Structures are given as C-alpha cells and as structure tokens.
C-alpha cells in the first residue's frame, strides 16, 4: 500500500456528479491508483459506485438549503458529526489527494481533507457553482470547472469528464441522409420531463403532416403507458418508441439527428462531445437557474436552440422541428458547431491535476 497512490473521491446525489467522477476514477485506476469513494447511503452513489468496482464509505449528511427552521438549527451539529466521520475515513485510508465533484458528502469531506492536511481538488460541473463548492473553493488546493467564469479567481477550465465510449462514438462522421425521417431523441431524465410527455404526442402528429419524423421518447418511471396511449390516439405509434429509461445512451446518441432535453451539465457536455444538435429546455426550478447558464455554451456556439419552459408551447416546438426537418444542411452545421465547443480530454485533465498534487506528497 505504501507505493500505491490513493485517492478519495467525493461525488453523489445525481448522475451529473457521479458519472464524471466515475470517468476520473477509472482513468486513475488504469494507472494503478487505489480509488475509494465517500458518499451517502441513501443516494445513487451507494448503488452505482460498487457496480463499477470501487469501494465506498458513507457519512450521515443531508442538504440544508431551503429546509425548515428546526433542521437548520440542527444542521451545524450534523455537519460537525459528518466531518468527524469523514476524518475517520481519511485517517484509515490515508489518501494522497481528495477529489470533490459535488453532492452532500463533498462539504464535510472537503473540510476533513483540509483539517487532515490532504490536498483537496474541486471540480464544478455546472456554469454556476453550488453552495458547497463556493465555500470549499476558499480552502481547496486546486479548483477546476467545466465552463468559463464559473468562479472568481484562479479556477482552471478543464471541461466535464465524460465516458470514453461517448468520446469514441464518432457520430459526426455519420452523414444525415436528406430523405430519411428526422430522428428525434427526447430525454427527460430518470423521472421524465412532464412538459415533454405532455407536448410531444401532439407535436409529433403536427410535424408528421408535413415531414417524416421518428421519435425515441424516454418518459420516466411510471409514465410509459399513458404517453404511449397518447401517441396511439393521435396515430403516431408506428413512428415512435417509448421507454421509461434508455439504458444504452450511446446507441441513442448514435441513432439521433437531434435531441430534446434538459440542460444539466453532464447532458450539455455529452451532447457537445458527440456533436448532436439539441433543443434545450432548462429545468426551471434548478438552483440559481444554473441549467440556463449551462445551455448558453451550446446556444452561443450555434449548436443548440434554447427553449425556456416558461414560454414553451406546442407551436414553438413544432416550429423548431419543422425548421430542422426541412433544412438538413443546417442540422449538420449545428452538430459540427456543438462538437466545436466540446472538451474531449477533460477526464485526463482532472486526473493529471490529482496526479500532480499527489506527486508532491510522500508515500506513507
């Protein structure tokens, strides 16, 4: 154990935190690093991280933003306890570097790393940093981010780590055949997006009156039967595939000509990496409206249309899809422009920072 470099990774809660962290974890593991995870037992990292072959420790911590008075009064004591729990993990594992990539465990874990004298690397996936990373950026050894102007100060823009399989997808090399049906991928996240489920059946029927279009619609848990019935009622079932989840997103990205989706940081980064034109509808209740800021990167490059949910209706969606269906050259150009802002070596950049900091630490 003395000659093997060790990293403790803190990431959890959502796929937007966990999947980029897994990409870095796998890159370091391939180089012989021992990887251990710090998370919470009731969030998705508890299931996903062991599935990918990494050990995980849990601390007791919840979010404090927007909760009631009693929970806020109790929060300092709970945070102190979770910091102590994280220090115990660090004391036992003896990491050379700690990497925080978001989620409830990152706050206590980051403070514990500082108290333990372990270099702390932060990575912020969103264009607007979360409260925890804003605070931790003051004590971190290195601060990394995916987008320009995320932090004030000396943050390094490195992009968002994504799965190597998506980088190798090569979607942009596959020409769009003008006479083919427009292939629309609709992705609303694990719970689906109600507005997509409500609008797309009638939108598909309207566009189909003038253009050939096929739809692959991910509707979220418990919504499949109802959405399928709506497509069927409008005579569109033959050109639509409805699924609660899409397990193989690589296949979905490869299939699609355009995607209708939210604007989470990971989604925006993946869409750019595969060169897929997009219709972005930021989640309107995201903290600090960070999804709108995420979307601007692709929109300003010309690789996406921004459709704020507050003004989105069937007519606007029909109009955008008809434009794309009738102008395949513009669709191809959008994909190329999306690809132009992709950062394809983000995983390696984050890993390199961790390696550089660890190299300054003596082996135990």
Curated annotation (Swiss-Prot):
Residues given in the record as UDP-N-acetyl-alpha-D-glucosamine binding sites: 14-16, 126, 163, 190, 246, 265-270, 291
Name of the top EC class for this enzyme: transferase
Catalytic activity: di-trans,octa-cis-undecaprenyl diphospho-N-acetyl-alpha-D-muramoyl-L-alanyl-D-glutamyl-meso-2,6-diaminopimeloyl-D-alanyl-D-alanine + UDP-N-acetyl-alpha-D-glucosamine = di-trans,octa-cis-undecaprenyl diphospho-[N-acetyl-alpha-D-glucosaminyl-(1->4)]-N-acetyl-alpha-D-muramoyl-L-alanyl-D-glutamyl-meso-2,6-diaminopimeloyl-D-alanyl-D-alanine + UDP + H(+)
GO cellular component: plasma membrane
Places the protein is found: Cell inner membrane
EC number, as in UniProt: 2.4.1.227
Membrane topology: Peripheral membrane protein
Entry similarity comment: Belongs to the glycosyltransferase 28 family. MurG subfamily.
NCBIfam families the UniProt entry points to: murG
Stated name of the protein: UDP-N-acetylglucosamine--N-acetylmuramyl-(pentapeptide) pyrophosphoryl-undecaprenol N-acetylglucosamine transferase
Naturally occurring in which organism (per UniProt): Shewanella loihica (strain ATCC BAA-1088 / PV-4)
Organism lineage: Bacteria, Pseudomonadati, Pseudomonadota, Gammaproteobacteria, Alteromonadales
